[in-house]
């Protein structure tokens, strides 16, 4: 059996390139022509804000392009209390206040969680003075056990010497 040629020949490459070119040109031809925001002036806020790049000024019923180079629209363009973007029922002042309160709440929550976790982790781990006190206590306990064992062995020797050793079963004699 002869090995099959799996590579693309120049004929197939040209055909594939032509198909891709047709698909890309067809996709770009289907886009509707972009309508400027100013065409929605003196209409409704809903019509203006269907296009996300538009800003509605409620004061003079004007629809204009959102000034993307600036974060907030300047007062010369429209007052913040009259400016609408995204939805018609929220003005920019309310949006700014709401977003700052939510952002502050999130930051405060994260800070509280971090402080709580750090404090909890710190309280779980004994500090150096606690470790030293525990070590000293353990050393005292070990010395006490050694002294106890030493005293017991001395007492047992004395009992053995004088024949006072405790028997396993005291009723064995009878």
Curated annotation (Swiss-Prot):
Record keywords? Cell membrane, Coiled coil, Cytoplasm, Glycoprotein, Membrane, Nucleus, Phosphoprotein, Signal, Transmembrane, Transmembrane helix
Quick one: signal sequence residues?
Answer: 1-29
The membrane topology term of the UniProt record is:
Single-pass type I membrane protein
Quote the biased-composition stretches of kind Basic and acidic residues, using this chain's numbering: 126-155
- Subcellular location(s) per record: Cell membrane; Cytoplasm; Nucleus
Identify the GO cellular component terms for this protein: cytoplasm; nucleus; plasma membrane
Tell me, in a sentence or two, what this protein's role is.
May facilitate PTTG1 nuclear translocation.
State the protein's name: Pituitary tumor-transforming gene 1 protein-interacting protein
Name the species this protein comes from: Mus musculus (Mouse)
Q: What is the lineage of its organism?
A: Eukaryota, Metazoa, Chordata, Craniata, Vertebrata
């Amino acid at each position: 059996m002869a090995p099959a040629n799996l590579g693309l020949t120049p004929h197939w490459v040209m055909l594939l390139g032509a198909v891709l070119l047709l698909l890309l040109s067809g996709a770009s031809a289907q886009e509707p022509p972009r309508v400027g925001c100013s065409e929605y002036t003196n209409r409704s806020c809903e019509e203006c804000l269907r296009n996300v790049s538009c800003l509605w000024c409620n004061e003079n019923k004007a629809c204009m392009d959102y000034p993307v180079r600036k974060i907030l629209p300047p007062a010369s363009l429209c007052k913040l209390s009259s400016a609408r973007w995204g939805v018609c029922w929220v003005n920019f002042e309310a949006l700014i206040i709401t977003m700052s309160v939510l952002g502050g709440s999130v930051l405060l929550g994260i800070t509280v969680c971090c402080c709580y976790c750090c404090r909890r982790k710190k309280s779980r781990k004994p500090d150096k003075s606690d470790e030293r006190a525990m070590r000293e206590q353990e050393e005292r306990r070990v010395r006490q056990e050694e002294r106890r064992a030493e005293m017991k062995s001395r007492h047992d020797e004395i009992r053995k010497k004088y024949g006072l050793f405790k028997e396993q079963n005291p009723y064995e004699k009878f």
